[in-house]
A protein has these predicted regions:
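Alpha-helical scaffold segments that form or flank carboxylate-/histidine-based iron centers
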Residues: 15-19, 62, 134-138
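Generic C-terminal helix-cap and adjacent flexible tail
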Residues: 152-155
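Hydrophobic pocket/interface hotspot
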Residues: 23-24, 33, 57, 74, ...
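Hydrophobic ligand-binding cavity/cleft-lining segments
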Residues: 1-44
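Hydrophobic-ligand binding "helix-grip"
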Residues: 34, 39, 47-50, 58, ...
Length: 155
């Protein structure tokens, strides 16, 4: 996985050994999403999942030391190439946690030789400091482990 920070953006890219349709399905199908969208030694519980333009998702990621809740508001979903959504920390009841920054995430998918797909994620934060706060929370390690889970699921 490659990662770079540009002002208020965090951009990472990773190539997965799977066709584009399978990778896209893993992001947009509840049963698949729950199996991989978490770091090693964690689990995901989806409470609501409608990964379409105008839809949303509410889920929890449980690690051995904590539970974090996320609200995703899907703006654009264009199968199998693009997902744009607003990602917010949430309360256990599914409301946005206004103490933490929301981010706009753009996921783009590109296929190579019908057997490999590169996922590029661009997260845009309200400020450079908000992006740095998320980096300091360990997003790089967490995303790398999460994408390891995706890679293992689709092999």
């Amino acid at each position: 996985m490659t990662i770079k920070v540009e002002d208020n953006k965090i951009i990472f890219s990773r190539t997965i050994e799977a066709p584009i349709e399978k990778v896209f399905d893993a992001y947009t199908t509840k049963a698949l999403f729950e199996k991989w969208f978490h770091p090693k030694d964690a689990s995901t519980k989806v409470f609501r999942f409608n990964a379409v333009s105008g839809g949303d998702a509410f889920y929890a990621i449980k690690t051995p030391t904590m539970i974090s809740y996320t609200l995703a508001e899907y703006k654009t979903v264009k199968r199998p190439y693009l997902i744009e959504y607003i990602d917010s920390f949430a309360t256990p009841q599914g409301a946005k946690d206004t103490k933490m920054p929301s981010m706009k995430i753009t996921l783009s998918f590109s296929e190579f030789n019908t057997t490999k797909t590169t996922v590029t994620s661009t997260s845009v934060f309200p400020t450079k400091e908000a992006a740095q706060q998320v980096i300091n929370m360990g997003v790089e390690q967490g995303m790398n482990q999460t994408l390891d889970q995706l890679d293992a699921l689709l092999k």
